Amino acid sequence: MTRNQIHSIFLSALVLVAALIATRPAAAQDPKQPYPTMAPVEQYLMDHDAEIALARSAAPDAISHDASVIVLTRHGYETAVEGKNGWVCWVGRGWMAMFDHPEFWNPKVRAADCLNPPAARSVLPYAYKRTELLLAGHSKPEVIAAIKAAIDKKELPPLEPGAVDYMMSKGSYLTDSGNHNGPHLMFYQTAKDGAAWGANLTNSPILAVNYWYISAEAYPQLESFPPLSVFLIGVDKWSDGTPAPSM
C-alpha cells in the first residue's frame, strides 16, 4: 500500500478521520468532486444486525464483545446494545471526515470504529451532533455554526486525555481510493499539528491531520475551533488476528 493510499484511507476513516495533508489542499472547491451533495438517506443506512456486526469488528473481540453499539437511523445514531466496559463501537459515514473532504457525502463509506471510554465520552458527542444536524437537512455552514455555539456554551465536552479509536475491521469501506481499507489505530490530541509526535516526516510510521479540515479556506470559521489533531498508526493485523497488508 502506498503512502498516498494510506493518506486517503485516513481521511475517510474519521469518524473521523484523515491524511490528504498535501495532496488535495483545494478539494472542497473542486467542481469535479464526485460527491457534491448528500445522497438520499436510504443510501447511508444499513441492516440493523449487519451494522452491529460491522461495528464490533472494528476491534478485537476482547474489547468489542462487551462494548456498547450504536447504529444509524434516519434521525441520528441510537443505542442498539448496552455494553459493560465503557467502549462504544459504531460505523461512521463519510460526513465524519473533515468538512472539506471530497468524500464527505460518499454513501459507500462504512468506517467501523471502537472508541475507548475517554473517546466515547469526549469525541462521540461531536459525531452525534454533526449527524443529527446533517440528517435534519442543515447545510455545512449551519452545522459548523451550531457546533461552535455548542462548544462555546460548553454543551459539547473538551477532549479527554487518552482518547483512542480502533479501526481494524476487515469489512470497512473507508474510501474509493486504493484497496478501500487498512487497519489502524487513531489517537486524539489537543495539538495544532503533529510536530511533537514526529508525524508526517520521511519514514515516520505516524500520520497526523487536523480533525476539522484539510484547508480552512472553504470554511474559515473552523480556524476558531479548539485545536484537535488525529494521529494514525497502521497495524499489520485485522481485528480477528489475521494478517493485513502492510501500511
Spans of features found by a protein language model:
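Bacterial N-terminal signal peptides that target proteins for export
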Residues: 2-13
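Bacterial N-terminal signal peptides
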Residues: 12-21
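Sec/Tat signal peptide C-region and signal peptidase I cleavage site
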Residues: 24-28
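Primary mode marks residue(s) on the alpha4-beta5-alpha5 output face of response regulator receiver
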Residues: 29-247
